[in-house]
Amino acid sequence: MKVAVLYSGGKDSNYALYWALKEGFDVKYLVNVESENKESYMFHIPNVHLTELSAEAVGIPLIKLYTKGEKEKEVEDLKKGLEKLDVEGIVTGAVASIYQKSRIDRVCEELGLKSFAPLWHKDPEWILRTVSELFNVRIVGVYAYGLGKEWLGKRITKENIDKLLNICEKYGIHKAFEGGEAETFVFDAPMFKKRIEVVEAEIEWHETWGIYHIKKAKLVDKE
């Protein structure tokens, strides 16, 4: 089956891509939606410019869509972009947001496409542990009390994941960050032919939240 994967470069959309390839789907496109609205209900924001490197690393064409990020209108912008693609299904990294999934399902139904969400209602702790084992995944944004500046740019590993999960438990943070408490970016994965290396980055910090801005990055051979 020919599919497109909605792709932000984060842990969930990379898992969706990993799953689709493992299932034997013919992944024709990665579709990234760039929103002008930093508070977008639908689309992941930090470091989306790096998805071009991600797509190159995987060897799958990237389709960039743009939206002002106005509620509901951004769904129409997604639909307009998807209807041009020669695919039979859409794969997403939706975990628990009924807001997101119901709208993607509706778009797929209207376009006659199948909708796949391999992480839907999976255990959040299982998700975080699985993606951190499969991928080189780093935290690139923190937006919840309890997650401090020290996590920005940090890779989630077997050495620190228990500490991270304990913080989530203590402060009521969703363990897969489904509420937008943190954002991630994947720098290497089994389906990447090369890995992404950060050349230049800076941390923006505002007392209770912050972003790891990747100014420059490049593809390098895997070791």
Curated annotation (Swiss-Prot):
Signal peptide: none annotated. One of its GO terms (biological process) is protein histidyl modification to diphthamide. Gene3D superfamilies: HUPs (3.40.50.620), putative n-type atp pyrophosphatase, domain 2 (3.90.1490.10). It holds the Pfam family Diphthami_syn_2. CDD domains: AANH_PF0828-like (cd01994). GO terms for molecular function: diphthine-ammonia ligase activity. This is Uncharacterized protein MJ0570. The lineage of its organism: Archaea, Methanobacteriati, Methanobacteriota, Methanomada group, Methanococci.
